Amino acid sequence: MNKKFACIGIVGHPRHPSALATHEMLFHWLVARGYSVMVERQIAQDLGLKDAVTGSLAEIGQKADLAVVVGGDGNMLGAARVLARYDIKVIGVNRGNLGFLTDLDPDNALQQLADVLEGEYIDEQRFLLETIVHKENQQCRISTAINEVVLHPGKVAHMIEFEVYIDDRFAFSQRSDGLIIATPTGSTAYSLSAGGPILTPSLEAIALVPMFPHTLSARPLVINGNSTIRLKFSQIGSDLEISCDSQIALPIQEGEEVLIRRSDFHLNLIHPKDYSYFNTLSTKLGWSKKLF
C-alpha cells in the first residue's frame, strides 16, 4: 500500500471561472473529509477564503504531503519546477487544453482523488534538466526545466551556428534555427512537434532535436540521461536565448557557453491506479488505435 496523505496543498493559477470553481470545490471537499489543507496564497485571495491556511509554492512544498495542481500543463510545469525541490507528491486536475501531465478529469476528479488519498495510485519520478549559462570568472545564470531546454534566437528568427559537446567530447556542429534538449517527460511536447522521438517516462535518456537544420543529414539524437551537454558559439551576432519549458528565458551574451545536465531534483508525479501512459498517448495525441 502506498503512503496516505495528511496535508494537501491546492495550487495553480486559474485563467477562467470554471478553473477557480474547481479550486473552491476541492478546498471544501478536502476540509469536509478532515484533511489539513494549504491553499496557494493567490488562489485563496481570489476565492475570498479568509480562514484558509495559505502559503507560497515553496511553503506548500515544505509542509504538505501532496500538491493538487489545477489547470493545464503550463500550470503543472510552473508548479513542478518549484515543488521538485521538496519531498512532496504532485497530481494534476486538467483545466487546460491538452492536459498531458494533469490526469484527473474535472468531472470525475473527486472520486479519482478519493482513491488516490487512500493510497491507490501509481508513483513516478520524473527528472529535470538544469541549465547554466556561464562565462569564466563571471556569475552564471541557472534555471531548471521539466519538459525541455531550447536554444533559439531572441526577437528575430535567424540561423544559429553552434557546436555541441557531450561529456566534453565533440559531438556535432550545426547551422539551424535552434536546438531542443528534451527529457522523457518533454518528449511528447515541443520536441515531438519538431520530429523528435517519444521517450517513455522511465527511460534515463535525453533527446537532442534540431530545429530546421540547414542540412539534409541532421537527425534527432538520444543520449544517456546522465550526460552533460555543452553548447559553444564561435560568435553571437545577435540575441540568443535559452528557454526552460517556454516559461523562463536566459539571455546568452558574447563569450558565454551553455551547460545542460540532469538536475539533482526530481518530480514525484503520481497518477490514478488505472493510469496507462500508452492510453494517454492515444487519447491525448491520437496515437495509433488498437486494430483487434
Curated annotation (Swiss-Prot):
It catalyses: NAD(+) + ATP = ADP + NADP(+) + H(+). GO terms for cellular component: cytoplasm. Its cofactor is a divalent metal cation. Transmembrane segments: none annotated. GO terms for biological process: NAD metabolic process; NADP biosynthetic process. Keywords: ATP-binding, Cytoplasm, Kinase, NAD, NADP, Nucleotide-binding, Transferase. InterPro entries: ATP-NAD_kinase_N (IPR017438), ATP-NAD_kinase_PpnK-typ_C (IPR017437), NAD/diacylglycerol_kinase_sf (IPR016064), NADK (IPR002504). The keyword NAD applies. Its EC number is 2.7.1.23. The keyword Hydrolase does not apply. GO terms for molecular function: ATP binding; metal ion binding; NAD binding; NAD+ kinase activity. NAD(+) binds at residues 73-74, 147-148, 158, 175, 177, 188-193, 247. The active site is at 73 (proton acceptor). NCBIfam families: PRK01231.1 (NF002306), PRK03378.1 (NF002893). Belongs to the NAD kinase family. Involved in the regulation of the intracellular balance of NAD and NADP, and is a key enzyme in the biosynthesis of NADP. Catalyzes specifically the phosphorylation on 2'-hydroxyl of the adenosine moiety of NAD to yield NADP. This is NAD kinase.
